[in-house]
Amino acid sequence: MADDEEIDIEGDDDAPLLFDHKDDALALPDLPGYEPNWMFDHGQEIYGRSWTSISQFVQTRTPLQVKNYARHFFKTKVVQKVEEGEDEDVDIEGEESGEEAVMELRSTCGLNPAQPAVVTSDDTSTGENVMEETEAVTEDHPSLDNLVQDDREMPQQETTGDGEQYPMDEHFLPVFPWQPDDTQNRVIVERIEGSVGLGSVRGDKDVRPVPGVEQNTYGPHTDMFQVQNTLLAFEKQVGADRIFEGPSXSKNEATDTQTEVSETKTEVIERQTESQVDATHMHTYGDGLMGSIERLTESVSSSELKEDLKTGIEYVEKDDATDSSSTAKGYDNYTLDHPEDRSKPDSVVSEKWSCEEAMSSHTDGRTFSDSDSGKETYDLPRYNTTIFQGHSEDETSDAGQAEEETFFTFKKPTEEVVLDRSVITEEEKEVHKEFFDGRQTKTPERYLKIRNHLLDCWERTKPEYLRKTVARAGLRNCGDVNCIGRIHGYLERIGAINFGCEEANRGEFPVAKVGVKRNPQGHGEQLALQAARLESMHVTSDELEKQDGGVSQIRPNRSRAARTNLNSFSYDPFKLVPCKRFSEESPAPFSVKIHATALVTIDMHAHISTAEVIGLLGGVFHRDPGALEVASAEPCNSLSTGMQCEMDPVSQTQASEALSQAGYSVVGWYHSHPTFAPNPSVRDIETQTKFQEWFAQGGSPFIGIIVNPYSSTRISPLSRVTCLTISSEWNPPAIQRVKLLSRYAGHTDTTYMDKMLYSLSGHLCRGNADSDEDGNSESLTLLTDIRDIFANSWTSSLGTTPRSSIASL
């Protein structure tokens, strides 16, 4: 954003709005009556310098746009402070003070769930009452001087563009907790110790009018609103001296706070005398909400709520007895009173409810009970927990999942359990609910197949420990690895498999979450919210053009398949190549006989190291029967790097001398693949080919042996051994010859030969540019000869006549 662009800092009505770009392709239509400047201002008070959160709060701007505007906003704010002569430091970056300001602002405005701010709403309220409210709110937070806010008058009704009213949910009335009133002026003084990150003294110009709501109406996008239960008229009991007194308040702190607040008392009274508060709207709002509470309580099962409340109270009394007792003294003294409606003189009965605040800071809603009967108690829905408690929806859902997760505890088995292969017990149905709830992919038959396969594998490998990765090799299309692992863990805990093994896990067994609702929102709402977030994070080419100041360059999107094909031709020396067995069609050039002593030496050498080992093979080659006899194996030192293995030249010489002294000649080499398949790698094939060429000069064969001692997919404890030799036969290469007589690139009259001759003539013409006609004739003769050579080679096999013209050349 340009530095010289005019930005609405003071809130004038005729100033341009935030990001007021007509041509911006990303600029969505703003909410009716909600100006982005006002949304940014109050979004900053709630979220601090979190531009992503503010952008989601505004809903029509991306985080990058919000960040650019904030940078320009604070830069202009510094210039304004300097021009006014103020020497207070303004925090521009807001790394530390912004976070402190948000915490102070949340706790001061009553956003802390442990200490809510209760505000009275009397018809005869004056500036003194406002000062008492400020004193009660800021009593526990001396870092802020005062916070004076009066939201007791409801603004005008919001309508759509066609003049129709928005429908209102009959259960709650959405109100912003920070909502300013256009019928009154307010003064907000926010001072943070050490800096003024969010602090400023704002009067008429700073506060923008917000479209209000009346009963049965609301503004668009109700998910932006939070229900304020504290906006109800709370009536103080007889004998109470103060509106609200927190459990940790003291008289000295109250006196100091009252002294600081009195400095702005005169200014507040003057501003409030300019516009009187209309209390009728509040009474109307109270009537509607009280009726909604009655309908809500009648529609909910009282027995279930009684049990939930009883459990919650017992939990609070046990875990937080001290805090709950002290807090109850401050909270239980307030009665929610539904006073007589002045607009309806006939109403005589006044409904009274006792407001009981939950003692735990994690309580999601306030609890209301009938003070007269004292029988039924109800919890209001958790509408106001997102902003007040400072927890996100993801944290709330994660906490719910942790609470709902259950475990099965099994006793340590004393003897091996033998299960009937055709019967599924009730315990298995309870533990593995996912296979018995009617799913198409997970059926009881599939569960039996997985369980019986694990039991069969255990019968073959006992008493060795059976790992689930080994058993999974024999299960194809039988479910995901998680469900196989859960069945393996269950059988292990009851003693059906891995009985007597030290590696067996006997701890708690988690139950698969079947039917647990991970997100409290509906599926449609969740998809809509996710789509809105993705849309807000999308950056178009037009926006990039505006940011960079020029035309954006769009790079072509390369397909994943193209990159995969290019990488497939790269040289990988560690790629394993499967071997091809000899058959009757391609018999082995000679037979191999290995002595048991040599095989024991190779296997023992491979077992003592997790890295690759290497050595030489000694034996005799019998030419008449064409048999190679391997009688001895000599281990050698290796130059292993963990990824490859090479033989030490000094050790190789010593091993060759030892085999010669024993009367054997070198007939091969061996090495190990500790944990992967005994297939040769590309590097092994190169080494084997090199050795075969050396020994083939003397007419002797040369073989290679690969041993795999620790196989992760083999159930048997025996090592896997592969004996290989490189065949002299090569597969014919793929046909890549170009058919010169075929059409070139879809042209009807041009062949590949015509294209080749035309290209050659261009080179010859440039070389004979300064020559005479004799040079041109020689070039034409050369092209004719080239055409005849290629044409004859193709026509001899196809029996056709080439159709190629050189007249134009």
Swiss-Prot record:
<keyword id="KW-0833">Ubl conjugation pathway</keyword>
<dbReference type="GO" id="GO:0006508">
    <property type="term" value="P:proteolysis"/>
</dbReference>
<dbReference type="GO" id="GO:0006338">
    <property type="term" value="P:chromatin remodeling"/>
</dbReference>
<keyword id="KW-0862">Zinc</keyword>
<keyword id="KW-0804">Transcription</keyword>
<dbReference type="GO" id="GO:0046872">
    <property type="term" value="F:metal ion binding"/>
</dbReference>
<dbReference type="Pfam" id="PF01398">
    <property type="entry name" value="JAB"/>
</dbReference>
<keyword id="KW-0645">Protease</keyword>
<dbReference type="GO" id="GO:0045944">
    <property type="term" value="P:positive regulation of transcription by RNA polymerase II"/>
</dbReference>
<dbReference type="InterPro" id="IPR009057">
    <property type="entry name" value="Homeodomain-like_sf"/>
</dbReference>
<dbReference type="InterPro" id="IPR007526">
    <property type="entry name" value="SWIRM"/>
</dbReference>
<dbReference type="InterPro" id="IPR000555">
    <property type="entry name" value="JAMM/MPN+_dom"/>
</dbReference>
<feature type="binding site">
    <location>
        <position position="684"/>
    </location>
    <ligand>
        <name>Zn(2+)</name>
    </ligand>
</feature>
<dbReference type="InterPro" id="IPR017884">
    <property type="entry name" value="SANT_dom"/>
</dbReference>
<feature type="binding site">
    <location>
        <position position="671"/>
    </location>
    <ligand>
        <name>Zn(2+)</name>
    </ligand>
</feature>
<keyword id="KW-0378">Hydrolase</keyword>
<feature type="compositionally biased region" description="Basic and acidic residues">
    <location>
        <begin position="363"/>
        <end position="378"/>
    </location>
</feature>
<dbReference type="InterPro" id="IPR017930">
    <property type="entry name" value="Myb_dom"/>
</dbReference>
<dbReference type="GO" id="GO:0003677">
    <property type="term" value="F:DNA binding"/>
</dbReference>
<feature type="region of interest" description="Disordered">
    <location>
        <begin position="320"/>
        <end position="378"/>
    </location>
</feature>
<keyword id="KW-0238">DNA-binding</keyword>
<keyword id="KW-0010">Activator</keyword>
<comment type="similarity">
    <text>Belongs to the peptidase M67A family. MYSM1 subfamily.</text>
</comment>
<feature type="domain" description="SWIRM">
    <location>
        <begin position="410"/>
        <end position="508"/>
    </location>
</feature>
<dbReference type="InterPro" id="IPR036388">
    <property type="entry name" value="WH-like_DNA-bd_sf"/>
</dbReference>
<keyword id="KW-0805">Transcription regulation</keyword>
<dbReference type="GO" id="GO:0005634">
    <property type="term" value="C:nucleus"/>
</dbReference>
<keyword id="KW-0539">Nucleus</keyword>
<dbReference type="GO" id="GO:0140950">
    <property type="term" value="F:histone H2A deubiquitinase activity"/>
</dbReference>
<dbReference type="GO" id="GO:0042393">
    <property type="term" value="F:histone binding"/>
</dbReference>
<feature type="region of interest" description="Disordered">
    <location>
        <begin position="113"/>
        <end position="140"/>
    </location>
</feature>
<protein>
    <recommendedName>
        <fullName>Histone H2A deubiquitinase MYSM1</fullName>
        <ecNumber>3.4.19.-</ecNumber>
    </recommendedName>
</protein>
<feature type="binding site">
    <location>
        <position position="673"/>
    </location>
    <ligand>
        <name>Zn(2+)</name>
    </ligand>
</feature>
<feature type="domain" description="SANT">
    <location>
        <begin position="33"/>
        <end position="78"/>
    </location>
</feature>
<keyword id="KW-0156">Chromatin regulator</keyword>
<feature type="compositionally biased region" description="Basic and acidic residues">
    <location>
        <begin position="335"/>
        <end position="345"/>
    </location>
</feature>
<keyword id="KW-0482">Metalloprotease</keyword>
<dbReference type="Pfam" id="PF04433">
    <property type="entry name" value="SWIRM"/>
</dbReference>
<dbReference type="InterPro" id="IPR037518">
    <property type="entry name" value="MPN"/>
</dbReference>
<dbReference type="InterPro" id="IPR050242">
    <property type="entry name" value="JAMM_MPN+_peptidase_M67A"/>
</dbReference>
<keyword id="KW-0479">Metal-binding</keyword>
<feature type="short sequence motif" description="JAMM motif">
    <location>
        <begin position="671"/>
        <end position="684"/>
    </location>
</feature>
